[in-house]
């Protein structure tokens, strides 16, 4: 379990990242980067994997991490595919930390064991998230509590980084109650929990029914940590109502695919489609102000959360303007 010393260190780094985010808009808060598109699983709802691609060469990955550092990115989350299939994952994590950025990872958890967790500790991983889809594996998903519970116990015993367990409700989930079972088990083990709404291949969703909504609400009440607290955007979506918000994808949030191109997110790949090596502050400023047509019904939590810092930033900007006009500053 994450020690108090590690938690304090991580919290200080988080506060520094948030402070800089409030002061300046011309840099990414969060970048999600793919070192490995291949996955050991084949979940029926997922469009983010293949079965054939090779890992991105380490030198290429390190260059991309360096570029994210040059763009003053706050957090880098490694995803896939399944990132733990990359043979030099630990070196990628170390490079993120060496460049002063917070290091996170999204994994299906199948490769986690005591020795592998200790290597992640040594590499400097700070966050890890696993989404667990059901209690018992089925034809849609093998990411079940039955399959992964031992891995969760290993994490509770050995991980010195923050662990968040995400459960899922929505279309395609046969037993909505499984989400609550997963959340309760994660809480028992001392992890933070969150609940997501399963989206379609464009990041949109259908409203939840009454049963799913009740389970969602209970999971939210059970949840703890930042993932659960910044979830207001889901309240409208579960009732089929749009959100009125400014998506900052391409600016505050970057999705970098295995080819090294910058996209809005995992579900809106193709634009801007600019190589990360060429992505500049001008691109960030342009996308910061660009409305996104998919935003009203978007369920992509990481984009909402990265964009949310500017919601809190606006009152500070207004206060600063007022203070200057009043000769306070």
Residue positions per predicted region:
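Cys/His-rich metal-chelating microdomains
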Residues: 38, 42, 46-49, 250, ...
């Amino acid at each position: 379990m994450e020690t108090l010393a590690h938690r304090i260190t991580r919290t200080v780094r988080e506060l520094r990242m948030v402070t800089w985010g409030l002061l300046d808009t011309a840099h990414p808060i969060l970048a999600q980067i793919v070192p490995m598109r291949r996955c050991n699983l084949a979940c029926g709802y997922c469009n983010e994997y293949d079965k054939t691609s090779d890992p991105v060469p380490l030198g290429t990955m390190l260059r991309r991490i360096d570029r994210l550092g040059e763009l003053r990115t706050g957090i880098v989350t490694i995803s896939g595919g399944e990132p733990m299939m990359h043979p030099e994952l630990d070196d990628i994590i170390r490079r993120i930390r060496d460049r002063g950025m917070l290091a996170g990872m999204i994994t299906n958890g199948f490769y986690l064991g005591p020795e592998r967790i200790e290597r992640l500790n040594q590499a400097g991983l700070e966050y890890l998230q696993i989404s667990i889809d059901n209690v018992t594996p089925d034809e849609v998903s093998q990411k079940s509590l039955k399959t992964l519970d031992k891995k969760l116990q290993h994490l509770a015993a050995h991980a010195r980084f923050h662990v968040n367990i995400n459960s899922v409700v929505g279309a395609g989930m046969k037993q909505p109650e499984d989400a609550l079972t997963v959340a309760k088990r994660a809480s028992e083990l001392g992890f933070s929990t969150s609940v997501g709404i399963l989206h379609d291949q464009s990041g949109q969703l259908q409203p939840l029914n009454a049963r799913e909504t009740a389970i969602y609400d209970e999971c939210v009440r059970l949840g703890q940590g930042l993932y659960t607290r910044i979830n207001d955007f889901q309240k409208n979506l579960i009732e089929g109502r749009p959100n009125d918000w400014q998506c900052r994808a391409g600016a505050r949030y970057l999705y970098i695919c295995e080819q090294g191109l910058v996209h809005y997110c995992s579900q809106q790949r193709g634009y801007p489609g600019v190589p990360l090596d060429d992505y500049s502050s001008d691109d960030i400023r342009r996308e910061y102000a660009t409305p996104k047509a998919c935003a009203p019904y978007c369920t992509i939590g990481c984009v909402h959360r990265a964009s949310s810092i500017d919601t809190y930033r606006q009152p500070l900007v207004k206060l600063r303007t007022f203070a200057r006009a009043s000769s306070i500053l």
